[in-house]
Amino acid sequence: MKLFHLSDLHIGKIVNGYEMWEDQRYVFDQILAYVREEQPDAVMIAGDIYDKAVPSAKAVTEFDEFLTELADSGTIILIISGNHDSAERLDFASSIMKKQNIYMKGTYGGEAMKVTMQDKWGDVNFCLMPFVKPANVKNTLSDLTEEPEKESAALTYTEAMQQAVAAMQVDPGKRNVLIAHQNVTNSGVNRRSDSETISIGGLDNIDRTVFDIFDYVALGHLHSPQQIGKPEIRYCGTPVIYSMSEADDQKSVTVVELGEKGKLSIRELPLHQLHAWYNFTGTLDEAMSREANEDYARIVLTDKETIIDVQARLRTVYKNLMSVEFQMADGSRPEQERTLEDVKNLAPDEAFADFYNRKMKRELSDENAVYIRQLIRDYYEQRQG
């Protein structure tokens, strides 16, 4: 059985003021071409369909067109919600969609959605587990423990997922595939991207051994492709580059071919980007020596003297200039006020860190930077309702 593993489409995303519609469509067209060529039995999309919980009308239309073209290929489509999605909105019309072989699981009501497919080796059971927090699991599973005094105790993410997996009643004698959108870790720290939502102190970490009962775990949430402890537990990464930290990633579609129980192979189909992502550090003269281009560019200038109209000059070469920063030879930044245009190019957490540095004359600690990101995330989540 051949499966395509995708995640983190983030339809409607805006990066440093640049709308990514054309970049997304360019990549989606490649995915559709691969589907027609490879004819997978199922396409799995592991969460973060949209970039916002309340997507724009255009974002909904873009996803509708992509989903329609996927469905026209005849493949079965399996979709879950991610932390960026509105679970309830993603559930809309899911019953009707099942009749078109599109299975969407947005909300968690105490059990994962189960879809069973067959091939020459028998059944393959898919468990669709949308993004959850421990409170979601605790509030929907009434039989967490037989000890009443412990029922009010808070669950860690690992404990919550253990309970959720136990509720799935997975048959270990059959082939089982989990689709999930969580932060799953092995020993150490996963490779993360600047475009991801970050939690404080790894509170959302889930130990990968929770999923050992599955033959393959199709994960979404982390934006760089990577396996977690073993090849069968995998993040496919975003199909589109969304930050400079992903500039060197080879984006791809993960292809999983299931054989008989215990046998599978994994390969990747490359996805090319509409724009290159260019990170440059050097003098203005060096930066201006390139030919005019449409790369998404981050320029860090090391010039010692003050430069007038630097952004206007750089934009004559870099049409899609995302940010300009200044750095002294020793790696520090010169003490100068930012222009309004400079501030507009900063993410909210970067703007706060810059403000803190200028007022307090010291860098914001890593711990406090993570805390500020979480506060900003909570603020936007509350606004999005």
Predicted region positions:
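Conserved catalytic scaffold of divalent metal-dependent phosphoesterases
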Residues: F92, I96, Q100-S199
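Metal-dependent catalytic neighborhoods of phosphoester/phosphodiester hydrolases
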Residues: I14-G17, G47-F66, S81-N101, G106, ...
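Active-site neighborhood of phospho(di)ester-bond hydrolases with catalytic His/Asp-centered motifs
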Residues: L6-S7, V43-D48, I76-N83, Y103-Y108, ...
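N-terminal active-site segment of His-dependent metallophosphoesterases
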Residues: M1-T68, D72, R373-D378, Q382-R383
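Binuclear metal-dependent phosphoesterase catalytic core
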Residues: A112-K120, V124, M129, I233-Y296
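Active-site neighborhood of divalent metal-dependent phosphoester/pyrophosphate hydrolases
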Residues: D8-G12, P40-K58, T75-E88, V184-G202
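Conserved beta-sheet core of the metallophosphoesterase superfamily
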Residues: V184-L264
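Accessory, non-catalytic peripheral segments of nucleic-acid enzymes
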Residues: E37, A42, L258-G385
